[in-house]
Amino acid sequence: MRRRDILRGSGVGLATLGLAQKTTARSECASAGAQTATLVLVHGTWHGGWVWQDVATGLRAMGHRVYTPTCTGCGERVHLTGPDVGLDTHITDIAQVLEFEDLNNVILVGHSFSGITITGVADRCRERIDRIVFFDALVPREGR
């Protein structure tokens, strides 16, 4: 099985992140006007936002707002890679999505290397983040 197929089928994995319980409660209250979750799903190395397509489709069908940006130098934006593109660029990419879309109470999900990216985004945009989720991702340690 290819890596992209594994991640595309990971919608079940996201349910284990606590969204299933929250979704059930929100689905029951949907007719009462309850808000749904806002998620920003950040891809790992060698991928692009497209890797979340099936997961995002499922979450949107449940009424959630889902964003799947592609970081500079990755996926369909690989042509933008260069010596100045790095972690800070990726943090800025995602932070700009939050700012330009005026997103608040965001559940920020990172896969693989983007665990480091979402940590930087959470530090930079802490007032916009509800929580961060490390989905089979690198988790930075204090002092390293």
PLM features per residue range, with description:
Residues I107, R131-V133:
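Residue in the alpha/beta-hydrolase core beta-strand immediately N-terminal to the catalytic nucleophile
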Residues V42-T45, S112, A137:
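Glycine-rich His-Gly loop
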Residues A37-E76:
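Conserved HGGG/HGGXW glycine-rich cap/lid loop of the alpha/beta-hydrolase fold
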Residues R65, C71-I107, D123-R124:
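Active-site loop/oxyanion-hole signature of alpha/beta-hydrolase fold enzymes
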Residues D5-R26:
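N-terminal export signals
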Residues V133-R144:
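Flexible "cap/lid" loop of the alpha/beta hydrolase fold
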Residues D54, G120-R124:
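Active-site signature of alpha/beta-hydrolase-fold catalytic machinery across serine-
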Residues G110, S114, I118:
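Gly/Ala-rich beta-loop-alpha elbow adjacent to hydrolase catalytic centers
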